[in-house]
């Protein structure tokens, strides 16, 4: 074999030059070029040095000064639900695709033309705060009659942007057996016309879950596969290369036609075996339904599974177990120490007759899961719920210590004292700074200006030494991580631009870390991803603007030009 051929065997597969390579290493150093071979980074440095690693068959990309970041890690997303609640499987009813009730009605009417009689029509994303009719008249809300006007034979179920409210037509109510006589379930609400007592078509929280969701026809395996492929294509187009599926398992079997069910894990595995995953997937297992998950469910699910955190591969792995502690602030179901402005303080969404019983049940679940070698990600938004989760984490780790890296999902109102406790015990937070941008305008009226300004205290978490990653919670929020960075840097609201809690703003570098290396830490994978360093997975995204210097109000509009996963180009918009 000649010298040239021997060199080609050692040469890089891909060389990227003339770029601004933001490595996100410990020094946040900037390089010009990077070389990749067999899906891994083999060199990072100056153009003249990296070019020497190119052989006859090496692909060379000249970025002409464009910026490169490590692949983005969305650490709390419902990816298959995101894909399954978007076209072609569902109707697009989120802003800015629709701006009025009439727009939504028109979109549903078009969908009716493409489905069989009796087939369910679903959608996600409507928001009264952006519907023209609701803005013009605050007493105007979406109704079943709106949807009945275009769909009398097909049941319709449209989730609002938060996923905690649904808007349905009369056919859906009929199939669910919901009438004016239906009692309102604990932890939920059936909105009824005050004049007639008839359901208006809006159902909230456990009323939506327990009455309507369970009668929606389960999607086929092929439809779930299509949902995953749709999601991955969209995620790659914006630079996302890793995700944590926020909840999949038997507890999600009745959500949106099975989009959080156990079969979804099997479908992911099929795609992994076929080499068709273009996003690295970490899965949190869900063993019981929202509001009904008990210690008995956890015992059955965890004790006999025979798995633990880390089972799987670089592409598909079990991350841990998902629990729900409370609800969300906009619904006043987040469990708070201090009452909401209008009264009430929320509560734990766990079986039990009293706060004490529910608290004890939560602690038992945490201790049991930790003992069996699973990382825990617990949905907790209110300060009292977060404190309860941290109580459980500390008790569990004291009884059975290991490098669990348990974390709170959301962590909206984490208190200064709780931050100290989290730092001492290596407990993290998975935040969604983009949701702060979406909701901060109306939080003042719910919890008062002081607490509203504190919500998602990113600077306090950083200063306190707490690891926090960032994500979208899609389909609750579109997974535009650039919007999330802008929100973390500016803390301006979506509707009015009002700054909420300026003292909690963080730098661009810190925000970028939350979407890259901090996500890798949460995944127990910081040694192989999260930064552009020798030996790590070659997951990169290329941007058309310099995210470190562009006007901060333009960060959200930066285009992704290219996404690379494992050294392969999976998206290219150059």
Task: Describe the function of each predicted region.
Residues 1-12, 573-574:
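Basic/polar N-terminal segments that are highly enriched at the extreme N-terminus
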Residues 6, 23-27, 313-314, 521, ...:
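Short loop/turn motifs at secondary-structure junctions and domain boundaries
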Residues 10-17, 22, 26-303, 319, ...:
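Divalent metal-binding segments
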Residues 273-278, 310-311, 396-403:
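Short helix-capping segments at alpha-helix termini
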Residues 306:
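Acidic, glycine-rich loop-and-beta core segments that form the ion-binding/anion-interacting portion
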